[in-house]
Amino acid sequence: MRHYGVALRRDAGLFGYERALNRHGLGPVAGVDEAGRGACAGPLVIAAVILAPEARQRLARLADSKLLTEQIRESVFEDVMAAAAAWSTVVISAAEIDRVGLHVANITGMRRAVARLSARPGYVLTDGFAVAGFGVESLAVVKGDRVVACVAAASVVAKVTRDRIMRALHTRYAEYDFAQHKGYVTAAHAAALARCGPCDEHRMSYVNVAAHAATTREARSLRLEDRVLVTSRHGVTETV
């Protein structure tokens, strides 16, 4: 594939895209990726990373975050922090996702993450779909988190950052077991939603969450009516 006269090859190794772009004076190259698109609870986290020229020697274990175990991801995260020339993260709350929609939140977050980098990139590589508005040239790379080093690095930073947030949320909402499933749809998460209804960290615009919210409201309404009915027999007015 050629882009602006630069030959970009998927089989050139994990650092191939960056080497080619830097060789043609288009660097530094920033990679952007996100974590949490498929979750129904918790934030969307977007990361942007520019790797230092010598990063290759420090990132032998770098790969798409989804291919790494949680323990190895945490270790690779520290490697990326040491090897990054610049990095940034943007955390978009569940409430903001409900307000603007997932796609808009994701696109806006990517732009903000790139804008917050301490070093201005000359080129931006994104994972999967094209994004305009970075202020510099950009290219979408299909499965970029598997074939482009800076995108893989961004995927690790986004995933580890979000996982840490979800573990922290678990201490506030232990009944949902966020530390285990990280807000994604699992049988255990669905059972917790059915049992407890959604909390403030759930994305209320999502169909499965909205359904449980409606069921919970109905159940609470029935319980309230029952309580008022019972207490009325005893001549007591209860305000709930």
Swiss-Prot record:
EC numbers, comma separated: 3.1.26.4
Principal cellular location given in the protein's record: cytoplasm
One Pfam family of this chain: RNase_HII
EC class name: hydrolase
Record-annotated disulphide pairs: none
Catalytic activity: Endonucleolytic cleavage to 5'-phosphomonoester
Domain RNase H type-2 span(s) in chain numbering: 27-226
UniProt-listed GO biological process terms: DNA replication, removal of RNA primer; mismatch repair
Entry GO CC: cytoplasm; ribonuclease H2 complex
Cofactor: Mn(2+); Mg(2+)
Record-linked Gene3D superfamilies: Ribonuclease H-like superfamily/Ribonuclease H
Cofactor, how bound (note): Manganese or magnesium. Binds 1 divalent metal ion per monomer in the absence of substrate. May bind a second metal ion after substrate binding.
List of residues binding a divalent metal cation: D33, E34, D127
Entries under CDD domains matching the protein: RNase_HII_bacteria_HII_like
Highest taxon of the lineage: Bacteria
Keywords from the named record: Cytoplasm, Endonuclease, Hydrolase, Manganese, Metal-binding, Nuclease
GO MF, any single term: manganese ion binding
Location(s), subcellular: Cytoplasm
Cited SUPFAM superfamilies: Ribonuclease H-like
Function, as annotated: Endonuclease that specifically degrades the RNA of RNA-DNA hybrids.
Family, per entry: Belongs to the RNase HII family.
Listed name of the protein: Ribonuclease HII
Species annotation: Frankia casuarinae (strain DSM 45818 / CECT 9043 / HFP020203 / CcI3)
Lineage, opening ranks: Bacteria, Bacillati, Actinomycetota, Actinomycetes, Frankiales
Gene name of the record: rnhB
